[in-house]
């Protein structure tokens, strides 16, 4: 049976910023001091004889306390716990998720820093009696550990404890203490009476709407409880106006008298099957005295190299990265109402050696965006909550009304990323995640990771493409490039439109309405592609053809005109065959001499990225497993 604490255990843990209880298996035995209930949990002070730190047991350990296995002044061995920061204070606390009682309850609090027996003997008797009302012999033990006198303990009923807590609590908290605090994970639409204690980890803007039922306003907040569970709460009209100013980002509240329903996946911003609605009769009270035990904003970071999987999806993502550059603010005219709105682009990088452009809009562009511009030379780390992934330049990110930006967050991910960048990242050449993906345009092009199909899906469904162009991505081999086809056309160097030879000399451009002495050649090439399901001919224009052949049309024309034993022109075409690419294509139907023909046109092409393809296959397997279950 353990009879002593681990000396200096707490100071050792607090001095190690990267401490991980799951990997550091050194034994840590502390004494439980000042054990008291907070909602459905218990807080205490962990004492190692020299240092004390605030701590909390998770709800899973509450039965151990109720059964008496863990008691006040008892000794416990910490098996699994985390060290968290207390909001708005420069102190920390332990969140204990697993422990075991290792000794019987001691008479008093352990104090290794107390005076020795000889020093204490010199103290006046009156002072000694004041500090030792029970027995002087209990003050000093042979090990040098001094025990503070055991406090008088009187058994109290639950109603007495709750009554005392309500009497000492601030008026704002008394409402919440009349009911049991429920964890978010336990809520469902069929409960009618609950109280939750949550932190506002994200707050949206007040938005006005107009529909067939009338006009109104709405705003929402993201709430997080002690377990780290999140839920989105939405308020309309009177409730929105009532609670918009009351809810402050980062503060903790008791909330009751709300309702739950299944979350709309189209608008869901957190990982929860339910969403909450608060009306004007809901109760919201601030719980400022206990905010330290509610975690800050919870992020689920996506590495930059994996962003392609989220392009044009409804799911919002969180991102962390090192700031590489910050642009000045620019004004963009919104199409819906012609209003000018501010925008600022920042470029972020992470350990995948990839970069991505994030567009900050509205207040984020002028507020935090300006802060980032002022400190860009310091390469700060930023974490962004709720980003929309688009396909501009392959992959692009944009903030929305509920997005939240944190500069230099105090998190393990941020510290690790900053350490990597300072030690090696700033010397490494980065590449854009969008390179190798087709740019966005009005023709409907998207990321090469979306709408992936086999060639047979395109060739065997001609009726799908009768009304308008349909876009797909496909992975295929180039099997043949016909050498005697018309490979290019003569183009204007200014506008790229077709030119005709002038009567005297030079070239005439209808687009520019002027004559030029020279022109350039631009590809208009047909290639046959093949995969495991079939084959088809596709049309490729200049930019995509250059990627396929590895040279410009002018360079290929020069090879074609050269004479020699080896036909360099045909050799160049053969080199491009039987290489695998990912194509973004549009499929349309054209009518020629009364016959409908399918036309497949390349909109984007990229070499095979084996890492990205592997992730895509794993995602497909995961989706199929979920469907079959």
UniProtKB/Swiss-Prot annotation:
Q: List, as start-end ranges, the regions of compositional bias called Basic and acidic residues.
A: 115-131
Q: What CDD domains does the record tag this protein with?
A: RPA1_DBD_A (cd04474), RPA1_DBD_B (cd04475), RPA1_DBD_C (cd04476), RPA1N (cd04477)
| GO BP annotation list | DNA recombination; DNA repair; DNA replication
> Has the keyword RNA-binding been applied to this entry?
no
The places in or outside the cell where this protein is found are: Nucleus
Subunit (UniProt) = Heterotrimer of RPA1, RPA2 and RPA3 (canonical replication protein A complex).
The family database entries (NCBIfam families) matched by this protein are listed as: rpa1
Protein name per Swiss-Prot or TrEMBL: Replication protein A 70 kDa DNA-binding subunit D
Source organism per entry reads: Arabidopsis thaliana (Mouse-ear cress)
Q: What is the lineage of its organism?
A: Eukaryota, Viridiplantae, Streptophyta, Embryophyta, Tracheophyta
């Amino acid at each position: 049976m353990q009879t002593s604490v681990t000396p200096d255990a707490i100071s050792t843990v607090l001095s190690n910023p990267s401490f991980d209880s799951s990997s550091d298996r050194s034994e840590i035995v502390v004494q439980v001091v000042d054990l008291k209930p907070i909602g459905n949990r218990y807080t205490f002070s962990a004492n190692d004889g020299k240092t004390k730190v605030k701590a909390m047991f998770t709800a899973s350990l509450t039965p151990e306390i109720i059964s008496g296995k863990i008691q006040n002044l008892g000794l416990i061995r910490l098996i699994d716990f985390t060290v968290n920061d207390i909001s708005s204070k420069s102190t920390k606390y332990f969140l204990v998720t697993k422990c075991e009682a290792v000794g019987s309850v001691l008479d008093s609090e352990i104090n290794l820093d107390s005076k020795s027996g000889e020093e204490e003997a010199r103290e006046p008797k009156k002072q000694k009696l004041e500090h030792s009302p029970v027995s002087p012999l209990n003050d000093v033990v042979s090990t040098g550990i001094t025990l503070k006198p055991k406090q008088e303990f009187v058994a109290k009923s639950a109603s007495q404890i709750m009554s005392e807590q309500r009497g000492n609590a601030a008026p704002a908290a008394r409402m919440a203490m009349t009911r049991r605090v429920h964890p978010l994970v336990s809520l469902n639409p069929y409960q009618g009476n609950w109280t939750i204690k949550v932190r506002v980890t994200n707050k949206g803007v007040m938005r006005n709407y107009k529909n067939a039922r009338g006009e109104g306003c709405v705003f929402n907040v993201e709430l997080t409880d002690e377990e780290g569970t999140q839920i989105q709460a939405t308020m309309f009209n009177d409730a929105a106006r009532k609670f918009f100013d009351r809810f402050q980002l980062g503060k903790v509240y008791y909330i009751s008298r709300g309702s739950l329903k299944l979350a709309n996946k189209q608008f869901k911003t957190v990982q929860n099957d339910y969403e909450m609605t608060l009306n004007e009769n809901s109760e919201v009270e601030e719980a400022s005295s206990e905010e330290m035990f509610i975690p800050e904003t919870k992020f689920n970071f996506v590495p930059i190299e994996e962003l392609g999987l989220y392009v044009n999806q409804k799911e919002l993502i969180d991102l962390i990265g090192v700031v590489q550059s910050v642009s000045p603010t620019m004004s963009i005219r919104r199409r819906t109402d012609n209003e000018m709105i501010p925008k600022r682009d920042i470029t972020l990088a992470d350990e995948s050696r990839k970069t991505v452009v994030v567009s900050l809009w509205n207040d984020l562009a002028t507020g935090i965006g300006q802060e980032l511009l002022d400190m860009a030379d310091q390469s700060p780390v930023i974490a962004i909550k709720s980003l929309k992934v688009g396909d501009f330049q392959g992959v692009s990110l944009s903030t929305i009304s509920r997005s939240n930006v944190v500069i230099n967050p105090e998190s393990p991910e941020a510290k690790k990323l900053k350490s990597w960048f300072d030690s090696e990242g700033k010397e490494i050449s980065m590449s854009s995640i969008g390179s190798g993906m087709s740019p966005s345009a009005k023709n409907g092009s998207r990321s090469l990771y979306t709408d992936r199909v086999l060639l047979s899906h395109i060739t065997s469904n001609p009726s799908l493409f009768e009304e308008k162009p349909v876009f797909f991505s496909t992975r295929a081999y180039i099997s043949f490039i016909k050498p005697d086809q018309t490979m290019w056309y003569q183009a204007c160097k200014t506008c790229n439109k077709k030119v005709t030879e002038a009567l005297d000399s030079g070239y005439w451009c209808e687009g520019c309405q002027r004559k030029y002495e020279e022109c350039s050649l631009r590809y208009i090439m047909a290639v046959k592609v093949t995969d495991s399901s079939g084959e088809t001919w596709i049309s490729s224009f200049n930019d995509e053809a250059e990627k396929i052949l590895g040279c410009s049309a002018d360079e290929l024309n020069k090879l074609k005109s050269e004479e020699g034993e080896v036909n360099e022109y045909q050799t160049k075409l053969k080199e491009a065959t039987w290489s695998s690419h990912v194509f973004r294509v549009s499929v349309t139907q054209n009518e020629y001499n009364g016959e409908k023909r399918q036309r497949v046109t390349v909109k984007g092409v990229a070499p095979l990225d084996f890492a990205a393809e592997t992730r895509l296959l794993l995602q497909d397997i995961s989706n199929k497993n979920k469907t079959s279950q």
